[in-house]
Amino acid sequence: MGDSTKKAETAKDEGTSQERREARPLPTAADFEGKDTSENTDGRAADADGEMSLERRLDSLREFLRERRGAIRVTNPGLETGRPRLQLAENMRPDPTNPYNRPSIEALSRIKPIAISNNMATSEDMMRIYVNLEGLGVPTEHVQQVVIQAVLFCKDASSSVFLDPRGSFEWPRGAITADAVLAVLKKDAETLRRVCRLYAPVTWNHMLTHNAPPADWAAMGFQYEDRFAAFDCFDYVENTAAVQPLEGLIRRPTPREKVAHNTHKDIAVRGANRNQVFSSLNAEVTGGMNGPELTRDYVKSNRK
């Protein structure tokens, strides 16, 4: 009886279990299609993101290459102007109140160089000359032209304080005597030669432009190759304190021209200074005669 009861219960459980299995709905095709659609959507989104990333990288590469392309390539860069200023350490900072302060190269670079020569007319001298020439009737816009004409005149004649000029300097619809102009230059610049030195580079370029060396170059003993060196202020052509031509010097003086000029200057100075041996020019000292000729033996310069 017990066995039959167990069999009946077992059969009942199996029947109930079968009913439950029969009651569970079976998966349909739509269930599988939805799962595939979700997976496909995620895959397509990942592919799209990858494509967009590649496009962005290509765009960045394109812009990078565009920035680097061009017909200009700067080589041998050595830029100093506009560089970032250095920040010195606390214990290296300068003390401008101490006379023994050691200035750095950075500090020295901020002090602009100013070329100055005491042997030529200053800006104040030239302003006096300009104002006085205006007062004599020279139009303001033609004052520099007159001054340059005077300097070129001295290139041919002389820049000596004993120069007695002839002629006149002209401008459109006007002229002024050379005596008047050179008198102003001598008075306001102390000597005429100081003004001529100031315009020596301008004189040099003018001679080369017109192939017009000093008129007396042959009489002064210069050779043809050195003729452009035959004026008083030749040794100031390369002086940076002088008035510079707009484009710069056409060419620099040659060593041969410098030798020729210095040789002639030495001879001329010794000839002019022969009376400097006297402490007084009174007749009791000079005897009414010029001093002895100052000579120099140039032959020894070639001996070894």
Swiss-Prot record:
Annotated Gene Ontology cellular component terms: helical viral capsid; ribonucleoprotein complex
More info: The N- and the C-terminus of this capsid protein may be exposed on the surface of the virus particle. The central core sequence may be important in maintaining correct tertiary structure of the capsid protein and/or play a role in interacting with the viral RNA.
Function in brief: Required for genome encapsidation. Forms ribonucleoprotein complexes along with TGB1 helicase and viral RNA.
Ranges annotated as biased composition (Basic and acidic residues): 1-24, 32-54
Pfam family, one: Flexi_CP_N
Residue ranges, annotated region (Disordered): 1-54
Keywords noted in UniProt: Capsid protein, Helical capsid protein, Ribonucleoprotein, Virion
Signal peptide: none
InterPro entries, alphabetized: Carlavirus_coat_N (IPR013569), Pltvir_coat (IPR000052)
Main location class: virion
Location in or out of the cell: Virion
Organism: Potato virus M (strain Russian) (PVM)
Keyword Ribonucleoprotein attached: yes
Gene Ontology molecular function, alphabetical: structural molecule activity
PROSITE patterns in the record: POTEX_CARLAVIRUS_COAT
Name the record gives this protein: Capsid protein
Family assignment from sequence similarity: Belongs to the potexviruses coat protein family.
